């Protein structure tokens, strides 16, 4: 080894923390280190295949791709090597000294507080890759050279995982990467051939590159290499020949998820656009699914050649939880992310994959309600972005949505729109719903009093996305949606409002005039209502104006919100209203009316512009009683 230049580096602080957590966490599933290293080696070979399309010289006269594993019991080492793309010195610093993932700091911070079993699961989910070597190793060395570079541009990386690493310039005859693990004394089980073969069979059987292990022929006294995996792309096989276990292990390899997938769909499509898709629905949401920089998307292959990870050209954002791959026969091998965006083939594939994904969810919802509920609890809020993003598939998306309602007596969202419609009253014209900040707030809204009395179900929407979603979800199966906190003629029919108002007494008419004079332009209008049973008054939004919940969303996003003026509705049958109606003293009357408006606004909005004034007025009126 000709050493030319040696430097000492410190790990990025997040790497130090992660290594410390792994080394000292007694990680229970230690064998995954080999899966991670083989997966990295396979990716390196995929990248070389792709780059050599435009630059064949990268092959260096060696196109026999392979991953090799050798054991040296006397030295206590396990060596994993590949003849893939390799790394430059800069690549080594960036890939083996840092973690270039957004949200890493917050992830590690949350990890430190978790219980051991949850911590182990999250470590696997985050995808620690190469760093998992330190779970079983006291020291790790990496020898690598980037394909196409001179032999004297090899790099040696060494570390014990305690805070620093060394990088040395070396000569390396062959391209690719060789990782040597100096195993801890208590991890010597990984020096046994049967153990390594078992791990490869369990996790890496589907790797498209041959994984070979070095063995010794006692009879002929020679070492030889034996292939120990199938080395065939799982997605290219007939799905009738693939076991459930094989799909599950392939999913884990593809995603770094430690859990089995909830459901999957494997399809070979022939015709104008020939492609294979293998789509998975995870059991749990990724830790960073709400991170704007979350790298979602499908793995893209063209004619079995790996092109890129996380291609977002084939699925919209509301389906970002779906994992998997697409292998196209029609896209060009030199396709880039930019070309994908404007490619007609891509657009056709996207339409097909969206349909395929939604149909997969539909199948799951009909085939296994329990599993679909698991899916909904994890990803329902993400799918709710669909109506705003995908008008072409609105009805299909709507059929997949789940809600809770006043008749459900539970906050669990498990009612489909089909089920709601099937339980509608014979003369019920619309699908009623209410949006609120929480389930409890929605469940106890005074707007529900009439519906409880008449046994009419109302959907209770309390996710942050709900109000936004309902702007796009306007009808389903011919039934329009109606917010019960907005003015609507169908609500008037339920209470025979017009008939009741014809019988309004002169005294009550004068009362309304007096209320309007007191409130002035604080409200849009004042009127009586007969849909309240326990509450003296409520406020309603005009049917054409912004709702309360939408105003909250705009405000939370830092956008300007127009002043909301509500319709003030008063229940003439409530004892408090009847008592206030008889008050002759103008100042006292005004105070009571202002208090009632504040109560109604507080019930609607959950806050008041001047809570101190409200408290003072309440205290004053209580003392006067």
Curated annotation (Swiss-Prot):
Annotated family: Belongs to the heat shock protein 90 family.
Function of the protein: Molecular chaperone. Has ATPase activity.
Residue stretches in coiled coil: none
NCBIfam families xrefs: PRK05218.1
Domain of life: Bacteria
Chain intervals for the UniProt region annotation (A): 1-337
A single Gene Ontology CC term: cytoplasm
Localization, UniProt: Cytoplasm
CDD domains the UniProt entry points to: HATPase_Hsp90-like
Record gene name: htpG
GO molecular function list: ATP binding; ATP hydrolysis activity; ATP-dependent protein folding chaperone; unfolded protein binding
B: region residues: 338-552
Record's subunit section: Homodimer.
Keywords of the record: ATP-binding, Chaperone, Cytoplasm, Nucleotide-binding, Stress response
Region (C) location: 553-625
UniProt KW ATP-binding keyword: yes
Name of the protein in its database record: Chaperone protein HtpG
InterPro entries named in the record: HATPase_C_sf, Heat_shock_protein_90_CS, HSP90_C, Hsp90_fam, Hsp90_N, Ribosomal_Su5_D2-typ_SF
